[in-house]
Amino acid sequence: SLSGGVIPINGGIIIDLSRMNRILEVSIENRYARVQAGVVCDDLNRVLAKRGFVFPPDPASSTVSTIGGNVATNAGGIKGARYGTTRDYVLGLQVVLPTGEVMHTGSYTMKCVSGYDLAKLFIGAEGTLGIITEVTLKINPLPRHAMTAVATYGKLEDAGKAIFQTMTSGVIP
């Protein structure tokens, strides 16, 4: 973890899920992927790219970060302003609760209006409420074009104004 999330403090424990690294299902028709928690973000995106799709959140550690870790920390990345964070892509979870019970949350659909969205409770909780073992994610079509722009400013205030003007102009970076 580049964020230090796996450093145990005050007698904490670490559970290594790296061998739970299978992509269980990709449904292009329904625009979701179901994966085990140990799947590395970039590995998932390589598989999805072959089919013209992507999982947009891109933490700086995407070469080593796992989907389960991304969910546990609600990882985002540089594309967050445009695409959102991991929370915006979680359709459902399988979680092992502290009691040992296995809980399933969410659905395989883009919109589920029945009951509470318990997945949101676990997203960003950093494993304190349960161990995420499986994740169902929304996937997006790959963008047709991508570009990177870099700008420098003499004053911090000018950079802030440029960001504000860009965001309020309707352009979503």
What is the meaning of each model-derived region?
Residues 1-20, 35:
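Glycine-rich N-terminal segment of FAD-binding domains in flavoprotein oxidoreductases
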Residues 22-26, 32-173:
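FAD-binding subdomain of flavoenzyme oxidoreductases
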